[in-house]
Swiss-Prot record:
Keywords: Activator, ATP-binding, DNA-binding, Helicase, Hydrolase, Nucleotide-binding, Transcription, Transcription regulation. Residues 491-655 form the Helicase C-terminal domain. The gene is rapA. Signal peptide: none annotated. PANTHER family: DNA ANNEALING HELICASE AND ENDONUCLEASE ZRANB3 FAMILY MEMBER, SWI_SNF-RELATED MATRIX-ASSOCIATED ACTIN-DEPENDENT REGULATOR OF CHROMATIN SUBFAMILY A-LIKE PROTEIN 1. This is RNA polymerase-associated protein RapA. One of its GO terms (biological process) is regulation of DNA-templated transcription. Interacts with the RNAP. Has a higher affinity for the core RNAP than for the holoenzyme. Its ATPase activity is stimulated by binding to RNAP. It comes from the Bacteria. InterPro entries: Helicase_ATP-bd, Helicase_C-like, Helicase_RapA, P-loop_NTPase, RapA_C, SNF2-like_sf, SNF2/RAD54-like_C, SNF2_N.
């Protein structure tokens, strides 16, 4: 294409960007600036999806200064079109270079296509209209970002995501107990921030071992393609940019990478919108000597607007460590540890009052006095009277309690920055039952242990303990690779018999090492032909998906899945309820992580935990410490990390040297300390914080709405019809799933997101949750979003001609159906769509210019129409031109009235909502310092910007259908 600086073009795929200007032509690339949104796009000159904008004599064009020009002729100089004509205000003869055209101009192209005989198939008009309706529905939903992820509809998770995800630059601490889904909550918030345009560039910092887990979670659950950055990736990226972090929008990296000054400086300079830090409780801090890791995160949190910290519960951490996390979120607010402790102490009255309000009994005098004092600036006596009175409707009393609770929440010290759910406050967890199976130590292992002891060597206590816990590994070290420990290990014999006696059950088996997992699979296959599959860190994501799918399959699937420690990270198998621990990890957190593969919200059965172990060995002693000391098999142990830190040396000594007195002593001390910590945690429970974190009835209402949307048959029909029109092959696979594949006859050369070898999808959430290899299709899924964009961003369905066979109407009667779009060019981050979503406006005109759309609905009208071929359609349009021209003008008049009303309503809604929120936050700031000034300033600026964008809103003709009555 011939490009010149200053020329005006429009994007064929992103028409909402408005009129673009060529700002750079270099080599094979052209750069176009779209001033309406402030965005740049770079295209290949040979294949740019752009259309040159040149007006014709008779057209009216608008300058960037706001005046119009009636075009009489046009000339060209150096590739730039110059329009000549009459100034709309002065009546003078003037010229206007195309470079100075108004960039908010919209292009009503369908008439040009119609009169040029470019007529689409009838069904494409319908699909285009449906696509615009779907875009409107999604953009106007206050649940945008929550429907699409492949996650269970868990109330507390959806509540936190709904509350935090819609904030500007959220800065919060997610501190739920293990198993309650902090990663999912963070993913939901990230997904919501991206879909709503509040964030575009996101950096996730995780421990080295969790990088792959996060990559998988973000892709499989949230359809977000993050890139993992390590030193090698940074070096490779230099070919594209001086700062490697600018080469991707969504990045996962480890703290280790950012400890290097060069990489940290680059990350600090990379203009992120949101920072997410997992395992934030490992960031060590004291006022005198913060750790390097803490300093890295602190530096990033000072320059990145939004921050999510995922951490252990505050009760696990201790107050000082908890304060250190809060300090990262808001150093101005949490500036002094002693002041923080004093403030925490003052919250006890708030918690006591909240406890009373959360119950159903009448309020004691002490609670009423506390409430009156805490909410001193508000008259709460009417609410108190309702709660205390007899014979009052229960719903009315509950509403009064809820109102006062909300007032308390708004004033709670960390209520806006800390979310912490516990198993005590969240229902729906199964019970856990522990089953142990002792076996005699094989002679081969005893011999290997003796030889190892004689050989000596300088090994750390931890290395000796690890060796004692895995005798099969020690044995293999002294034998050649052909030796097979599984041929004599009694735990393997037990496992085979267990699987044979539980043929109908799915069994998850976890071992520490990938080599152990592979050997177990070989043993099951060669000795008994038991169907099992393996899951370890040496496999690719696709291989793991296939293994997980094979295990999940009810008919013909694997009975057992054998995982290594690292390989099982980030994968959950709630459809299984039997867990075999072939060995035990040294760390209580890893043990909980193993059990957590099954013990999650959504598990429908009680969990049976099975441990085959070798008697009188380190395996038995570690089992006793976990079971008798921590009760870690049958209950979650939030204090496990603390207890292991305190007793690690004693435990390692007991594992390495068999001393029954030392073991008894260790178990007694551990039990005693465990009870102390548990009691302290129970005493420290913050009822108000729990209420705020799980959302109560509001959370349930969100989940109910999402569940109703899941069963939307209209959406399913529309999406399948969309794929039909585009030309995607669809094969019914059974089990509520469809295989989608690109076909040779697709309407578009590529369908971004649709793999060449196809993808299996389902509209059923339960099916998607049980199968990692099946994508959950909702309106938010990229395959749906891309499909909508392909249709609405192209000319597909913009013109159509149809025949209406109806003898009640005179033959030759003409109707003109016009679909307009009320839209405005604005960056996604402005949130304009919340008030003025892209809205299709339907006008149905008879030949006299009367609008019949209110009397004749779209669906019933559409069913009566028959298609005509393109050639005949073109002739009918040509013959009808004298009637059509005035109808277009009339249709625009009708639609403009609707748009003006919509803009007025949008302005009123925006002003009411944002003013109310601003007023609320301003008044709260006086009593709760957690209200950040940045949030208030953002709301003020947003109101100004939105008014500007609403002023620039325009009407765009999107599609035309001409209908003629025939009796033939």
């Amino acid at each position: 294409m011939p490009f010149a600086l200053g020329q005006r073009w429009i994007s064929d795929t992103e028409s909402e960007l408005g009129l673009g200007t060529v700002v750079q032509v270099e080599g094979r690339m052209v750069t176009v600036l779209f001033p309406a949104t402030g965005e740049n796009r770079m295209f290949s000159r040979a294949e740019a999806p752009l259309t040159r904008v040149i007006y014709n004599p008779g057209d009216s064009v608008e300058s960037h200064e706001g005046w119009s020009l009636a075009v009489s002729e046009l000339t060209e100089k150096d590739g730039i079109v110059i329009y000549h004509g009459i100034h709309s205000e002065t009546g003078e003869q003037v010229t206007l270079r195309e470079t100075l055209l108004n960039h908010n101009i919209r292009f009503n192209k369908p008439q040009d296509r119609l009169f040029a005989g470019q007529i689409d198939r009838l069904d494409r008009f319908g699909v285009r209209y449906q696509c615009q309706m779907l875009r409107h529905k999604l953009a106007s939903s206050d649940l945008l970002g929550l429907q699409g992820p492949r996650v269970g509809l868990i109330p507390h998770q959806m509540w936190i995501a709904h509350e935090v995800g819609r904030r500007y630059a959220p800065r919060v601490l997610l501190a739920d107990e293990v198993g309650l889904g902090k990663t999912i909550e963070a993913g939901l918030i990230i997904h919501q921030q991206l879909l709503t345009g509040r964030a575009e560039r996101i950096l996730i910092i995780v421990p080295d071992t969790l990088r792959h887990q996060w990559l998988v979670e973000m892709l499989r659950r949230f359809n977000l393609r993050f890139s993992v950055f390590d030193e090698d990736r940074c070096v490779e990226a230099y070919a594209d940019h001086d700062n490697p972090f600018y080469t991707e929008q969504l990045v996962i990296c480890s703290l280790e990478l950012l400890r290097k000054k060069k990489r940290l400086d680059q990350a600090l300079d990379a203009d992120w919108d949101l920072l997410v830090v997992d395992e934030a409780h490992h960031l060590e801090w004291t006022e005198e000597a913060p750790s390097r890791a803490y300093q890295v995160v602190e530096a990033l949190s000072e320059v990145i607007p939004g921050v999510l910290l995922l951490t252990a519960t505050p009760d696990q951490l201790g107050h000082e460590s908890h304060f250190a996390r809060l300090r990262l979120l808001d150093p101005d607010r949490f500036y002094d540890y002693d002041a923080f402790l004093a403030e925490e102490d003052s919250y006890k009255d708030v918690a006591i009052a909240a406890e009373a309000l959360a119950g159903n009994a009448k309020l004691p005098d002490a609670a009423i006095n506390s409430l009156t004092e805490l909410l001193g600036e508000k008259d709460i006596s009417p609410s108190i009277r309702l709660i205390q009175a007899d014979g009052i409707d229960a719903e009315v009393q509950q509403a009064a309690r809820s109102e006062l609770l909300q007032e308390l929440l708004d004033r709670h010290g960390t209520g806006r920055v800390l979310y912490r759910n516990s198993r005590a406050s969240v229902k729906g967890f199964p019970k856990r039952f522990f089953n142990a199976y002792p076996h005699a130590m094989p002679d081969q292992y005893q011999t290997a242990a003796r030889v190892s002891g004689m050989m000596g060597g300088h090994k750390s206590l931890e290395a000796k303990a690890a060796q004692a816990l895995s005798p099969e590994k020690l044995y293999q070290e002294f034998e050649d690779n052909s030796a097979s420990w599984w041929k004599f290990d009694p735990r393997v014999d037990w496992l085979i018999e267990f699987l044979k006696s539980h043929r109908s059950k799915k069994v998850l088996i976890i071992a520490s090492q990938a080599e152990t997992a592979l050997s177990l699979e070989e043993a099951l296959r060669t000795r008994e032909g038991i169907q099992a599959t393996v899951f370890h860190e040496g496999m690719s994501i696709i291989e793991r998906d296939k293994a997980g799918a094979y295990f999940a399959q009810e008919e013909g699937g694997a009975q057992a899945l054998i995982c290594s420690e690292i390989g099982s990270e980030g994968r959950n198998f709630q459809f299984a309820s039997h867990l075999v621990l072939f060995d035990l990890p040294l760390n209580p957190d890893l043990l909980e992580q193993r059990i957590g593969r099954l013990d999650r919200i959504g598990q429908k059965n009680d969990i049976q935990i099975h441990l085959p172990y070798l008697e009188d060995t380190a395996q038995e002693r570690l089992m006793q410490w976990y079971h008798q000391g921590l009760n870690a098999f049958e209950l979650t142990c939030p204090s496990g990390h603390v207890l292991y830190s305190e007793f690690a040396e004693d435990l390692l000594n007991v594992l390495v040297v068999d001393d029954s007195d030392e073991l008894t002593n260790l178990l007694n001390h551990t039990q005693s300390r465990y009870k102390e910590l548990k009691h302290a945690m129970e005493q420290g429970r913050d009822k108000l914080l729990e209420i705020n974190s799980h959302g109560g009835e509001k959370a349930m209402a969100i989940v109910q709405r999402l569940a109703q949307n899941d069963g939307d048959t209209h959406l399913i029909g529309s999406v399948i019809r969309l794929w039909d029109i585009i030309g995607v092959d669809q094969e019914d696979k059974g089990e509520n799933s469809i295989i989608l594949r690109p076909s040779e006859h697709m309407m578009f050369p590529t369908y971004p997101g649709l793999p060449e070898d196809g993808v299996t999808v389902t509209f059923d959430r339960d099916t998607a949750l049980s199968r990692d290899d099946i994508a959950l299709i909702t309106q938010e899924h990229p395959l749906v979003q891309t499909g909508l964009d392909l249709i609405t961003g192209s000319e597909t369905g913009t013109t159509s001609v149809a025949i209406l066979k109806n003898k009640a109407l005179p033959a030759g009667t003409l109707f003109l159906e016009l679909i307009y779009m009320a839209d405005a060019s604005a960056p996604k981050s402005s949130q304009l769509y919340r008030y003025l979503p892209p809205t299709p406006i339907r006008v149905l005109l008879d030949k006299n210019g009367n609008d019949l759309s209110a009397k004749v609905d779209y669906a019933s009208f559409d069913k009566q129409l028959s298609a005509v071929n393109r050639h005949i359609g073109g002739k009918l349009v040509t013959a009808s031109q004298p009637i059509l021209h005035p109808l277009f003008a009339k249709g625009e008049e009708y639609a403009q009235v609707v748009v003006d009303e919509m803009v007025a309503q949008a302005r009123e809604k925006m002003t009411q909502q944002l003013s109310a929120e601003l007023s609320r936050l301003e008044s709260l700031k006086a009593v709760n310092p957690n209200i950040r000034e940045e949030e208030l300033e953002y709301l003020r600026n947003q109101m100004q910007e939105l008014n500007t964008y609403l002023d620039a809103s325009q009407l765009q003709l999107d599609a035309i259908r001409m209908v003629l009555v025939s009796h033939v």
